[in-house]
Amino acid sequence: MQWEVVIGLEIHTQLATQSKIFSGSATTFGSEPNTQASLVDLGMPGVLPVLNEEAVRMACMFGLAIDAEIGKRNVFARKNYFYPDLPKGYQISQMDLPIVGKGHLDIALEDGTIKRIGVTRAHLEEDAGKSLHEDFSGSTGIDLNRAGTPLLEIVSEPDMRSAKEAVAYVKAIHALVRYLGICDGNMAEGSLRCDCNVSIRPKGQTEFGTRCEIKNVNSFRFIERAINSEIQRQIDLIEDGGKVVQETRLYDPNKDETRSMRSKEEANDYRYFPDPDLLPVVIEDSFLETIRAGLPELPPQKVERFQTQYGLSAYDANVLASSREQADYFEEVVKIGGDAKLAANWVMVELGSLLNKLGVEIDQAPVSAAQLGGMLLRIRDNTISGKIAKTVFEAMAAGEGDADSIIESKGLKQVTDTGAIDKMLDEMLAANAEQVEQYRAADEAKRGKMFGFFVGQAMKASKGKANPGQVNQLLKAKLEG
């Protein structure tokens, strides 16, 4: 039987506010346990929550960016459940009247097509604390620093049909919230976490199958692996005569499998009711218009502009626009270096490789956009070749200065003097007389392969400094003359 996969995602986005959603406690990551927890966060009697307006503003920014309905009147509710790191015994969230209603987000698939994914809603809520199992022998510690940190939970429609589509959607959300400046997107620190709802059904069937939720997956790679693992588990289970049970599961990356955590709760299990300590939030049109006016250029618009303005391919434009910092870096390089396609290649390949090696983001790049742009100018005016440029780039990355000073101090200027190149080629060909005779006796197909040998010998003789274009032109004339 052929199966169709149905996937919906819930993405928990930690908002980049300086203080918590209902208290004045700081939200700094990595502080000593329980040093950023106020009486409100601890759920002490007699204290009242006060809503952080910045969290509301950030949620509205997201809603406007996905062309969603904004709840002009939204209500906070108590979600009741017991967990050791939830001191109040309930979580303040939103149920019936969320701040962001239906919207959509377009994602780019691997084949270059665009697919629209519906967003059901996005609601504000507070994060829970954190249980510390490793630091205690025979017991568990509780760190409430995270309790009360503002979250925007983004709930998609079940519109995705493969793990790759799900990853593309999460990447699009990740890029968007970073562009908006409402989340740092650091998945390793838990700033963006994903719950994956997965079900299967016979191809052609419209009724949904029984879904299972995979909780708290925190990397793009693990999202893809977790979903594929769960898909295969459900297929094997049904084809062996079993039945999928609705439940919450965890993904084990070491075993590459999901395992049962608990039965899946429904909304009525949480006994939602409006929080009596918080008034309904009324959002005025003037508030939204101020936010709308301040929205930055968003990833889809930037991708389109990069293609039309700079002549980049859809793939290159999507890669460069995947983060606001990278897009800004690229445009700064183009402003100085002039050639957009050359700049795109260096930013994506050479700089990308360097950043991966160092394990840092582009805002910590050891080579500034101004330095890289200056080096590209020297490639374009034939001061250095593309090969020598890699040596210059490595020196800039090592902190040895800008391109001009490195080229000067290391004597890396390209040899463009025709007489000097001509003499060097004569010496190289004399040293390879046997290969010259073989070349002249060969047919066109073999000559093409052999020509590369002579070019390599010429560049070796010049220590990479000879202008490749001139070498090719003069060498061809000498070999075929």
UniProtKB/Swiss-Prot annotation:
| Classification via InterPro entries | Asn/Gln-tRNA_amidoTrfase_suB/E (IPR017959), Asn/Gln-tRNA_Trfase_suB/E_cat (IPR006075), Asn/Gln_amidotransferase (IPR018027), Asn/Gln_tRNA_amidoTrase-B-like (IPR003789), GatB (IPR004413), GatB_C_1 (IPR042114), GatB_Yqey_C_2 (IPR023168), Gln-tRNA_amidoTrfase_suB_CS (IPR017958)
Listed PROSITE patterns: GATB
Q: Which Pfam families match?
A: GatB_N, GatB_Yqey
GO terms (BP aspect) = glutaminyl-tRNAGln biosynthesis via transamidation; translation
Q: Which family does it belong to?
A: Belongs to the GatB/GatE family. GatB subfamily.
User: Function, please?
Assistant: Allows the formation of correctly charged Asn-tRNA(Asn) or Gln-tRNA(Gln) through the transamidation of misacylated Asp-tRNA(Asn) or Glu-tRNA(Gln) in organisms which lack either or both of asparaginyl-tRNA or glutaminyl-tRNA synthetases. The reaction takes place in the presence of glutamine and ATP through an activated phospho-Asp-tRNA(Asn) or phospho-Glu-tRNA(Gln).
Instruction: From the Swiss-Prot or TrEMBL record, give the protein name.
Output: Aspartyl/glutamyl-tRNA(Asn/Gln) amidotransferase subunit B
* Species of provenance: Pseudomonas putida (strain ATCC 700007 / DSM 6899 / JCM 31910 / BCRC 17059 / LMG 24140 / F1)
